[in-house]
């Protein structure tokens, strides 16, 4: 069985990051995140949103890691976060599920792809 600890550390790091500083060192150069709207954004774009203060993270809690699978130098994970944040002054309280792809780059696991659900995850569907 593959060691999932580095992926778990990345998930926990993302879940507990309070600003944009976690993102750039922990993503691949071609990283994209797909927002609930379906629109993709690069890591630099996400950092720009945080730095502009349009996006203000108030709290984030990892509720559950549903799955981690590793296949050589590629891995994927599915996890749910309880997030409170404000976007352009409007507060959101979301229970969102993330699906992420990770790549092992020179021995270091990094986020390569992230897709976030709308903030209405029903945890009973994961039982």
Where are these regions (language model features)?
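Short, low-complexity N-terminal intrinsically disordered segments enriched in polar/charged residues
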Residues: 1-25, 29, 73, 123-127
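A solvent-exposed, acidic/Ser-Thr-rich amphipathic alpha-helical stretch
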Residues: 6, 20-71
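Beta-strand residues in well-ordered beta-sheet regions across diverse protein folds
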Residues: 34, 78-80, 112
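Short, cysteine-centered beta-strand-loop-beta hairpins and adjacent loop/turn segments enriched
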Residues: 56, 84-93
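Short, surface-exposed coil-to-beta transition loops
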Residues: 60-63, 78-80, 93-98
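A short hydrophobic beta-strand element
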Residues: 72-83
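Short beta-strand edge/turn micro-motifs at domain boundaries
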Residues: 95-125
């Amino acid at each position: 069985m593959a060691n999932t600890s580095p992926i778990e550390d990345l998930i926990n790091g993302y879940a507990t990051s309070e600003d944009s500083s976690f993102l750039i060192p922990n993503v691949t150069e071609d990283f994209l995140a797909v927002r609930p709207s379906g629109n993709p954004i690069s890591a630099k774009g996400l950092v720009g949103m945080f730095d502009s203060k349009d996006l203000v993270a108030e709290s984030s809690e990892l509720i559950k890691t549903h799955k981690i699978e590793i296949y050589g130098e590629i891995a994927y994970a599915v996890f749910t976060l309880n997030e409170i944040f404000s976007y352009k002054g409007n507060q959101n309280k979301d229970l969102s599920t993330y699906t992420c792809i990770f790549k092992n780059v020179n021995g270091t696991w990094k986020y390569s792809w992230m897709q976030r659900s709308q903030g209405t995850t029903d945890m009973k569907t994961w039982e």
